Protein backbone atom coordinates (compact mmCIF):
# COMPACT_ATOMS: atom_id res chain seq x y z
CA UNK A 1 0.00 0.00 0.00
CA UNK A 2 1.25 3.45 -0.86
CA UNK A 3 -0.06 6.91 -0.23
CA UNK A 4 0.99 10.43 -1.04
CA UNK A 5 -0.14 13.91 -0.18
CA UNK A 6 0.72 17.25 -1.70
CA UNK A 7 0.00 20.89 -1.16
CA UNK A 8 -0.05 23.88 -3.45
CA UNK A 9 2.67 26.50 -3.76
CA UNK A 10 1.55 30.01 -4.61
CA UNK A 11 3.36 32.57 -6.75
CA UNK A 12 2.45 36.08 -7.78
CA UNK A 13 1.49 35.49 -11.43
CA UNK A 14 -1.55 33.62 -12.87
CA UNK A 15 -1.62 30.00 -14.06
CA UNK A 16 -4.14 27.21 -14.01
CA UNK A 17 -3.09 24.30 -11.84
CA UNK A 18 -4.53 21.34 -10.04
CA UNK A 19 -3.38 20.45 -6.55
CA UNK A 20 -3.33 16.78 -5.64
CA UNK A 21 -4.13 16.58 -1.95
CA UNK A 22 -4.33 12.86 -1.62
CA UNK A 23 -3.49 9.76 -3.62
CA UNK A 24 -3.76 6.23 -2.36
CA UNK A 25 -2.90 2.89 -3.91
CA UNK A 26 -3.78 -0.53 -2.61
CA UNK A 27 -1.85 -3.68 -3.45
CA UNK A 28 -4.92 -5.79 -2.73
CA UNK A 29 -7.35 -4.19 -5.16
CA UNK A 30 -6.42 -2.53 -8.44
CA UNK A 31 -9.64 -0.53 -8.53
CA UNK A 32 -8.89 1.17 -5.21
CA UNK A 33 -7.10 4.23 -6.56
CA UNK A 34 -8.50 7.55 -5.48
CA UNK A 35 -7.69 11.11 -6.36
CA UNK A 36 -9.08 14.23 -4.85
CA UNK A 37 -8.37 17.17 -7.11
CA UNK A 38 -9.00 20.78 -6.27
CA UNK A 39 -8.64 23.74 -8.59
CA UNK A 40 -6.00 26.22 -7.51
CA UNK A 41 -6.40 29.94 -8.18
CA UNK A 42 -4.37 31.34 -11.06
CA UNK A 43 -1.15 32.61 -9.49
CA UNK A 44 1.87 31.31 -11.38
CA UNK A 45 3.30 32.15 -14.78
CA UNK A 46 6.62 31.24 -16.33
CA UNK A 47 8.09 34.13 -18.22
CA UNK A 48 11.46 35.31 -19.31
CA UNK A 49 12.67 37.97 -16.87
CA UNK A 50 14.73 39.71 -19.55
CA UNK A 51 13.37 42.44 -21.77
CA UNK A 52 11.90 41.31 -25.07
CA UNK A 53 14.38 43.48 -26.97
CA UNK A 54 17.30 41.85 -25.16
CA UNK A 55 16.04 38.35 -25.98
CA UNK A 56 15.57 39.30 -29.65
CA UNK A 57 19.06 40.80 -29.89
CA UNK A 58 20.60 37.73 -28.22
CA UNK A 59 18.71 35.51 -30.70
CA UNK A 60 20.16 37.51 -33.59
CA UNK A 61 23.69 37.32 -32.19
CA UNK A 62 23.40 33.57 -31.59
CA UNK A 63 22.14 33.04 -35.15
CA UNK A 64 25.04 35.07 -36.49
CA UNK A 65 27.72 33.39 -34.34
CA UNK A 66 26.48 29.90 -35.25
CA UNK A 67 25.87 30.82 -38.91
CA UNK A 68 22.27 29.60 -38.68
CA UNK A 69 19.90 30.14 -41.58
CA UNK A 70 17.20 32.79 -41.33
CA UNK A 71 14.49 30.13 -41.17
CA UNK A 72 16.06 28.49 -38.09
CA UNK A 73 13.85 29.29 -35.11
CA UNK A 74 15.73 30.62 -32.11
CA UNK A 75 13.73 31.57 -29.00
CA UNK A 76 14.40 32.28 -25.34
CA UNK A 77 14.14 28.60 -24.49
CA UNK A 78 16.58 27.52 -27.22
CA UNK A 79 19.67 25.87 -25.77
CA UNK A 80 23.02 26.47 -27.38
CA UNK A 81 23.61 22.71 -27.52
CA UNK A 82 20.32 22.13 -29.37
CA UNK A 83 21.39 24.77 -31.89
CA UNK A 84 24.61 22.83 -32.52
CA UNK A 85 27.00 24.91 -30.41
CA UNK A 86 30.00 23.30 -28.77
CA UNK A 87 32.02 24.84 -25.91
CA UNK A 88 34.12 26.97 -28.28
CA UNK A 89 30.96 28.25 -29.99
CA UNK A 90 29.54 29.17 -26.59
CA UNK A 91 32.69 31.15 -25.74
CA UNK A 92 32.38 32.99 -29.07
CA UNK A 93 28.70 33.69 -28.40
CA UNK A 94 29.56 35.18 -24.99
CA UNK A 95 32.30 37.31 -26.57
CA UNK A 96 29.82 38.53 -29.20
CA UNK A 97 27.31 39.39 -26.49
CA UNK A 98 29.96 41.28 -24.50
CA UNK A 99 30.85 43.33 -27.57
CA UNK A 100 27.24 43.99 -28.63
CA UNK A 101 26.03 45.04 -25.17
CA UNK A 102 29.24 46.71 -23.92
CA UNK A 103 29.49 44.43 -20.90
CA UNK A 104 32.04 42.10 -19.36
CA UNK A 105 30.87 38.62 -18.34
CA UNK A 106 32.86 36.82 -15.65
CA UNK A 107 33.91 33.26 -16.45
CA UNK A 108 31.82 31.84 -13.59
CA UNK A 109 28.72 33.60 -14.95
CA UNK A 110 29.48 32.57 -18.53
CA UNK A 111 29.56 28.92 -17.48
CA UNK A 112 25.96 29.13 -16.24
CA UNK A 113 24.62 30.23 -19.64
CA UNK A 114 22.89 27.35 -21.43
CA UNK A 115 19.96 29.05 -23.17
CA UNK A 116 19.20 32.31 -24.94
CA UNK A 117 17.05 33.26 -21.95
CA UNK A 118 19.94 32.62 -19.54
CA UNK A 119 22.11 34.95 -21.60
CA UNK A 120 19.42 37.64 -21.85
CA UNK A 121 18.73 37.53 -18.10
CA UNK A 122 22.44 37.85 -17.33
CA UNK A 123 22.83 40.73 -19.79
CA UNK A 124 19.89 42.65 -18.31
CA UNK A 125 21.29 42.18 -14.81
CA UNK A 126 24.75 43.40 -15.90
CA UNK A 127 23.41 46.34 -17.92
CA UNK A 128 21.33 47.39 -14.89
CA UNK A 129 24.45 47.72 -12.69
UniProtKB/Swiss-Prot annotation:
The organelle targeting sequence, given as a residue range: 1-49
Localization per Swiss-Prot or TrEMBL: Plastid, Chloroplast
Gene Ontology CC: chloroplast
Residue numbers of O-(pantetheine 4'-phosphoryl)serine PTMs: 87
Pathway the protein takes part in: Lipid metabolism; fatty acid biosynthesis
Keyword Cytoplasm: no
Coiled coil (UniProt feature): none
Predominant place of localization: plastid
Swiss-Prot/TrEMBL keywords: Chloroplast, Fatty acid biosynthesis, Fatty acid metabolism, Lipid biosynthesis, Lipid metabolism, Phosphopantetheine, Phosphoprotein, Plastid, Transit peptide
Carrier domain: residues covered: 52-127
Entry's Gene Ontology molecular function annotations: acyl carrier activity; phosphopantetheine binding
Record's comment on post-translational modification: 4'-phosphopantetheine is transferred from CoA to a specific serine of apo-ACP by acpS. This modification is essential for activity because fatty acids are bound in thioester linkage to the sulfhydryl of the prosthetic group.
Keyword Cytoplasm: no
InterPro entries the record matches: ACP (IPR003231), ACP-like_sf (IPR036736), ACP_chloroplastic (IPR044813), PKS_PP-bd (IPR020806), PP-bd_ACP (IPR009081), Ppantetheine_attach_site (IPR006162)
PANTHER family in UniProt: ACYL CARRIER PROTEIN
Role noted for this protein: Carrier of the growing fatty acid chain in fatty acid biosynthesis.
Family that this chain belongs to: Belongs to the acyl carrier protein (ACP) family.
NCBIfam families attached to this UniProt entry: acyl_carrier, PRK00982.1-2
The protein, known as: Acyl carrier protein 2, chloroplastic
Source organism per UniProt: Hordeum vulgare (Barley)
Lineage: Eukaryota, Viridiplantae, Streptophyta, Embryophyta, Tracheophyta
Amino acid sequence: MASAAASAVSFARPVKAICVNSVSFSALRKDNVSFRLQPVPQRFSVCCAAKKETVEKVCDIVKSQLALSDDTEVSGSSTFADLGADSLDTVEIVMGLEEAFGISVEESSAQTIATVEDAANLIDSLVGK
